[in-house]
């Protein structure tokens, strides 16, 4: 195994990806990828939620439109606003400052969990705390990223904020 072997594998992987896309993926999977890359391809279908989400976040501006005053959230243009797109509702109704504060609070929580992982007395406590920090970080990045159109829509809840009993209960445990 040399460095040349790694390069060969990387080149084969790069060549394989387009081949997989064109010859292996079913049409609905291709559509999901295409709409993720450009939501305007299907603005009333697969791209609808992300376009409405971005519009909601952008219309909130710095201070927001006020609680229960957001046009996208209150008029029903943003459907799963209490679960998948809760961050869009926060951005529209409460504005950039509160939306940024939500991110800061998550980063504080994750930083504290990493601190606990570093100062734990045994390996098990360290692994559990680091794992919890990783889960919160993943959920935060995935949910906020999908509401901004940076990541594909997956349905991952925003911890402690999204509506849903099982997710909230799991986060508290």
Task: List where the protein language model places each region.
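Short, small-residue-biased leader/transition segments that mark boundaries at the very start
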Residues: 2-7
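Hydrophobic alpha-helical transmembrane segments of membrane transport and translocation systems
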Residues: 148, 165-173
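Short aromatic-rich membrane-water interface segments that cap or initiate transmembrane helices
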Residues: 39, 156-166
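Hydrophobic, glycine- and aromatic-enriched re-entrant/interface helices and adjoining loop segments
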Residues: 11-100, 121-125
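Transmembrane alpha-helices of multi-pass, membrane-embedded glycan-processing enzymes
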Residues: 102-109
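Transmembrane helix-bundle signature of multi-pass membrane transporters/permeases
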Residues: 77, 89-92, 132-136, 164-167
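Loop-to-helix entry and N-terminal half of a specific, functionally important transmembrane alpha helix
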Residues: 116-154, 161
């Amino acid at each position: 195994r040399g460095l040349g072997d790694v390069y060969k594998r990387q080149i084969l992987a790069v060549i394989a990806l387009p081949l997989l896309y064109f010859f292996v993926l079913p049409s609905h999977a291709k559509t999901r990828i295409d709409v993720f890359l450009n939501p305007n391809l299907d603005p009333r279908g697969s791209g609808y939620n992300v376009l409405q989400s971005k519009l909601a976040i952008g219309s909130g501006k710095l201070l927001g439109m006020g609680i229960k005053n957001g046009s996208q959230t209150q008029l029903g243009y943003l459907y799963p606003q209490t679960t998948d797109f809760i961050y869009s509702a926060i951005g529209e109704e409460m504005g950039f400052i509160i939306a940024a504060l939500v991110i800061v609070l998550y980063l504080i929580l994750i930083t504290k969990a990493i601190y606990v992982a570093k100062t734990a007395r045994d390996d098990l406590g360290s692994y559990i705390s680091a794992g919890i920090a990783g889960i919160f970080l993943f959920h935060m990045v995935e949910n906020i990223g999908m509401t901004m159109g940076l990541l594909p829509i997956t349905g991952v809840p925003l911890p402690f904020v999204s509506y849903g009993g099982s997710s909230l209960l799991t986060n508290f445990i």
